[in-house]
Structure formats: C-alpha cells, structure tokens
Amino acid sequence: MKKKIFTSAKLLLMGVILSYYLVFTACSALTLEFEERDLTITNLDGKIIPIRVELARSIREMSKGYMGRENIPEGTGMLFIFKRDEKLSFWMKDTPTPLSIAFINSSGEIRETRDMTPFSHQSVDSSEPVRYALEVPQGWFEK
C-alpha cells in the first residue's frame, strides 16, 4: 500500500513539474525580446532617414516577428538578418498591423518594397536573392 502511494506521489510531482515547464515555455515565447539598433536609410534624394529597428536573427525571432503586435510606432521597424543571400518569403499570419517590407541586398541597397495585408496567409516573396528584409508600418517607405 505504501509503495502505491509513493508511486502516485511521484507521478503527481512529475505532472506538476511538467505543467510548470509548459507554462514557463509558453510564457517565454510570448515575451520574446528583440535587440534594438539605430539605423539610417539614405533615400534617392540623398536625405538620411533614421529608424530604430528590432533585430530578428534567430529562427525563433524570425518566426515571431510582429505577430500579435497591434501598435508599431512610426520610425521603427524590424530587420530580418539572414546568413546568406536567398529568395525570401514572408506572410502576415497573426499580424494585425498593415506592414510594408523592403528586400535589401548584401550591399545594403533596397531592391524592392511591397505592402502586406494583416492576417494574410499569402506569401510575399522577394523577386531576387537578398540578405535582409525590413518590415515597417505600411506606407513608411513612401514618406
């Protein structure tokens, strides 16, 4: 009888530990913090435009992106940094804010910009291999 109670207590303790682990992992995914940097973009007229960006380097950071964010302040963005030039593909799953994306080559030159629709599962692809992608509030590149 004592052995059965001991085994049940061990199982209960393992269940409690597993529950705490699952809750902690879920919460840490929600509270992912991105490193921030100040960058500048030089437009075609030679005007220098400052922007504060969050850096997305890891798969986890890239997967999270702006998902769930309802407010992205003007003058800010998220810079996705890839290890090599490749054709990139983005979507807006669980992203409620309209965004524009710039596809940027390894020399830092913006090759193209595209607008993206909130919550869309349709992919937005770069037309050529690039190293970076910069997401900003929709319309920011036109200003």
Residue ranges: model-predicted function:
Residues K2-L13:
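Bacterial N-terminal signal peptides that target proteins for export
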Residues K4-F6, S19, G46-K47, I51:
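Short secondary-structure boundary segments
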Residues T25-A26:
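C-terminal motif of bacterial Sec signal peptides marking the signal peptidase cleavage site
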Residues L13-L22:
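Hydrophobic helical h-region of N-terminal Sec-dependent signal peptides
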Residues A29-K143:
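Compact, glycine-rich, soluble single-domain proteins
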